[in-house]
Amino acid sequence: EVELAYENAKGDVLAITGTNGKTTTTSLLGEIMKCWKESVYVVGNIGNPYTQAAPKMTEESVTVAEISSFQLETIDQFHPKVSAILNITPDHLNRHHTMEEYIRVKELITKNQTSEDTCVLNYEDPILRAFGENLQIRVLFFSSERKLKQGLYLEDETIWYADESQKLAICKTQDLNIVGKHNYENVMAAAGMA
């Protein structure tokens, strides 16, 4: 379905995968993008079929897509402008058989990305940290455990964004309607993708 929809869609694609947190992050990113763009489609495993939304899209549209490992197995041309892998833990091994195969399939989300594209990754996941260090595209890490020189991180109950030239407070955790470290990670991933 993803490949068929992508062939018929227009505009930029922001795609999210991971073992946990996909639906929350997709919803958060969809709401963020609706503040900036008029034509936003939130699709995928979240309940809105990508194939139904694709014919309505224009070049100005933004698609926020939740993508499962099953869907990633069949991609060919699918090219997100921004991708995210939230985490990788043992799951669906009945289908993928080994953890190595599951990791390989999740990493396919970056298959067609170029140096002009971005992948957002969880720095606290050692698999993703190693993967990100070897990617030939722009990588933006997020962390709930440590301050990052570049990326998004949680410190003093505030979510921060930092790069070589600036440090910006994104929001206070008390201002969010969701709680828990895992949800703060979802917020950081969504903010990084936006």
Indicate where each model-derived feature is located.
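Phosphate-binding loop of NTP-binding sites
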Residues: 1-123, 127-138, 153
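Adenine nucleotide phosphate-binding catalytic loops in nucleotide-utilizing enzymes
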Residues: 98-100, 137-194
